[in-house]
Curated annotation (Swiss-Prot):
GO terms for molecular function: preQ1 synthase activity. It is found in: Cytoplasm. Transmembrane segments: none annotated. Its EC number is 1.7.1.13. One of its GO terms (biological process) is tRNA modification. It comes from the Bacteria. Pathway: tRNA modification; tRNA-queuosine biosynthesis. One of its GO terms (cellular component) is cytoplasm. NADPH binds at residues 88-89, 257-258. The lineage of its organism: Bacteria, Pseudomonadati, Pseudomonadota, Gammaproteobacteria, Pasteurellales. This is NADPH-dependent 7-cyano-7-deazaguanine reductase. It comes from Mannheimia succiniciproducens (strain KCTC 0769BP / MBEL55E). Keywords: Cytoplasm, NADP, Oxidoreductase, Queuosine biosynthesis.
């Protein structure tokens, strides 16, 4: 399926747009998850049973009743079972529309964002706003696990290729549980081709996955065009197909753009983690 021949034509992403300073929920634009899941064969039933698109919104401001500007940071969780994901530029424009709008308090802003995102996503959305003083305890974290990035390998082909994972467990004779991490994940925006930089954590139980093959596979996303959420679901499906682990979690955290970072989490056995902040976020 060519995504750009369908509903993505109407997205504001990659187009010149006006910045609206007064609240307007219609600025939010959905992207059907089925556009990517159809190609993966997982539209009706996903191989993961837990998941969310975890967003951090750093640029939220509104006016209080007296007209004094207020600021906050938001944690947002959009359930993986929602019909749509939220297009990121539209989310940015939507948040900007709060700038010159009066709200009674932070709770009203939080409730408004939660309701609007739920309608756009057609699914469950959780929103938690934090004052800057309450956010001051947040520290730079790191993904737990063994980092693959120091492997001494040579790469000359950067085209996406899931078949790199073929026979990735052929040398394994026992079931292991391990957590693997790479900070070399890079893909490109589906619409604008702008680079998206991320770190990925893979926690699995099953036959041991060849570390070199896995790193080569992750690097092959380097010139691949897909949204963050779609990349994580593709990684999950490819590992399931070629490694067949009993348990699997794929969690990626991408760098911030437009005051937003997007951090998709998919698992068949672990709960959604508390939002954190990596070094590049």
């Amino acid at each position: 399926m060519d995504y750009k021949d369908n509903s993505l034509k109407t997205l504001k992403l990659g187009q010149k747009t006006d910045y609206i300073a007064n609240y307007d929920r219609t600025l939010l634009q959905p992207v059907p998850r089925a556009l990517n899941r159809d190609g993966l064969g997982i539209t009706k039933q996903q191989p993961f049973s837990v998941g969310a698109d975890i967003w951090t919104a750093y640029e939220i401001s509104w006016l209080n009743i007296k007209g004094l500007p207020q600021v906050a940071i938001a944690d947002v969780e959009i359930d993986y079972r929602s019909t749509n994901l939220i297009e990121s530029k539209s989310f940015k424009l939507y948040l900007n529309s709060f700038n010159q709008t009066k709200f009674s308090d932070m709770s009203e802003v939080q409730r408004t964002i939660s309701e609007d995102l739920s309608i756009c996503a057609e699914g469950n959305v959780r929103v938690q706003l934090h004052s800057l003083s309450n956010y001051s305890h947040e520290r730079i974290a790191d993904f737990a696990g063994e980092c693959l990035d120091e492997l001494d390998i040579e790469i000359s082909d950067y085209g996406f290729n899931a078949e790199i994972l073929q026979n990735c467990t052929a040398l394994s004779t026992e079931i292991v549980e391990e957590t693997l991490v790479s900070h070399l994940l890079k893909s490109n925006c589906l619409i604008t081709s702008q680079p998206d930089w991320g770190s990925v954590q893979i926690h699995y139980q099953g036959k041991r996955i060849d570390h070199e093959k896995l790193l080569r596979y992750l690097v092959s996303f380097r010139q691949h065009n897909e949204f963050h959420e779609q990349c994580v679901e593709r990684i999950y499906c490819d590992i399931m197909k070629y490694a067949r682990p009993e348990k699997l979690t794929v969690y990626a955290r991408y760098t911030r753009r437009g005051g937003l970072d997007i951090n998709p989490f998919r698992s068949n056995f672990e709960a959604i983690p508390q939002n954190l902040r990596l070094a590049r976020q």
